[in-house]
């Protein structure tokens, strides 16, 4: 049972790699930096920025509509481009990067990706990058590992698709562990070309009988309008609203809702804002909802296919992995509209320790997690529903950070009512062939082929 599900009323998803974290607020991935920059200055564009480089100094007021103006950075310090002209160019080495260090809290997919980009694009020396992980193994929620006492345990997995631009950009640079000379992206691409994902039985009724949804959405005109209205509603108008506040039975009784909630694990009482963000993120794959054909998967579980190659890449670059290190707080100096991380408080194998930060230190934190505070059950024991999980791991860390400034979000929105935020998953390790005919009968595929089974 996982207590970190989304009843949250506020939030913005910020990464194509883990959109499941609707719990990420504007403070998500709290990126601190010693006395360096943490938050972008507002209104930093304008006249001052125009004085910095030659061509922009004398540009006309309307230059934003020309090729000259399209690369001006916005207030977040980024600009948007198109085509692949910039996609494959290697960045210049940042000035002074050899004098900087990075502290990354956790070792899940987002944390390891941050470290990989620091090595590849940031060209930071590997031994200047420190990954602080409370557990004794990397991977975070990508933890499909065989446990001799429980069998295979896998709390979650990423549902990947064509437009995971950051993920694919990263894994084109991570060497495959099995195919010499190939990248993880190469082997992933070849696999999904030869064995594309789709389901032959999207839903069942009566203990395994095909529900025969026939790919239809069964949405009324009113239901379609409710979805369109949500899609167009400003984010701020959806704070503190649930999906039940914006949809009625016209949507909830449709096959579309069956497809949607089973693909993305939504409940009726979850955040309306997160629902909207998912619509915006995956609207281009609406045709793949009825049979999962929009999705792509790795050959093995994602710990072995994604995490281990990243970990080896980082270890070979000299990155410092510190297991058994639980970060409990990041201390900020808040003044003049800036938030600067000055220290990290952590518990190393049970002993309290601290890390003092300088202006050359960067800190990366992912706050909130769908799998934090996991309570395990087994063949003979149900998960202990009375266990206190709201103070575990990253929830406690986020609360300690949030106490320092309201801008860091409201974690209690996502972990205060466990009955509405928990979610359950189950993995079954078979000991013989007795169950296989039942799987074959439902999925219309032999699970022993090594190819797609359920879709």
What spans do the regions from the language model cover?
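Glycine-rich loop(s) and the adjacent beta-strand/alpha-helix scaffold that form part
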Residues: 347-449
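N-terminal Rossmann-fold NAD(P) dinucleotide-binding loop
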Residues: 111
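Glycine-rich FAD pyrophosphate-binding loop
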Residues: 119-146
């Amino acid at each position: 049972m996982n207590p970190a599900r989304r009843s949250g009323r506020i939030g913005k998803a910020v990464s194509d790699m883990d959109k499941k974290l609707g719990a990420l607020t504007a403070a998500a991935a709290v990126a601190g930096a010693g006395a360096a920059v943490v938050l972008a200055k507002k209104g930093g564009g304008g006249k001052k920025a125009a004085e910095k480089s030659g061509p922009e100094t004398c540009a006309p007021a309307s230059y934003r509509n020309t090729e000259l103006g399209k690369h001006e950075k916005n207030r977040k310090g980024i600009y948007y481009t198109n085509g692949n002209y910039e996609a494959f160019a290697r960045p210049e080495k940042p000035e002074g990067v050899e004098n900087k260090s990075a502290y990354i809290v956790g070792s899940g997919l987002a944390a390891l990706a941050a470290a990989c980009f620091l090595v590849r694009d940031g060209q930071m020396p590997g031994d200047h990058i420190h990954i602080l992980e409370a557990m004794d193994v990397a991977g975070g929620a990508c933890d499909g590992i065989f446990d001799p006492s429980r069998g295979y345990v896998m709390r979650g997995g990423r549902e990947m698709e064509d437009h995971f631009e950051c993920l694919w950009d990263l894994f084109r640079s991570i060497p495959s562990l099995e195919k010499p000379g190939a990248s993880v992206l190469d082997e992933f691409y070849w696999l999904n070309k030869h064995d594309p994902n789709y389901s032959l039985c999207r839903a069942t009724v009566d203990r395994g009988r095909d529900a025969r949804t026939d790919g239809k959405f069964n949405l009324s005109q009113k239901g379609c309008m409710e979805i369109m209205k949500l899609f167009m509603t400003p984010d701020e108008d959806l704070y503190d609203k649930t999906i039940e506040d914006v949809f009625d039975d016209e949507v909830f009784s449709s096959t579309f809702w069956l497809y949607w909630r089973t693909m993305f694990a939504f409940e009726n009482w979850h955040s309306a804002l997160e629902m909207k963000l998912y619509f915006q993120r995956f609207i281009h794959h609406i045709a793949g909802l009825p049979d999962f054909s929009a999705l792509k998967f790795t050959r093995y579980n994602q710990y072995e296919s994604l995490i281990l190659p990243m970990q080896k890449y980082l270890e070979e670059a000299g990155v410092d992995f510190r297991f058994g290190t639980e970060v409990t707080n990041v201390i900020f100096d808040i003044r003049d509209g800036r938030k600067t991380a000055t220290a990290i408080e952590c518990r190393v194998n049970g002993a309290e320790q601290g890390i003092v930060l300088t202006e050359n230190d960067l800190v990366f934190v992912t706050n909130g997690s769908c799998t934090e505070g996991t309570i395990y059950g087994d063949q003979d024991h149900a998960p202990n529903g009375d266990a206190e999980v709201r103070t575990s791991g990253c929830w406690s860390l986020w609360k300690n950070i949030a106490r320092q400034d309201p801008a860091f979000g409201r974690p209690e929105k996502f972990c205060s009512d466990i009955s509405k935020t928990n979610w359950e998953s189950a993995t079954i390790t078979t000991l013989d062939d007795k169950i296989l005919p039942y799987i074959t009968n439902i999925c219309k595929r032999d699970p022993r082929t090594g190819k797609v089974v359920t879709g």
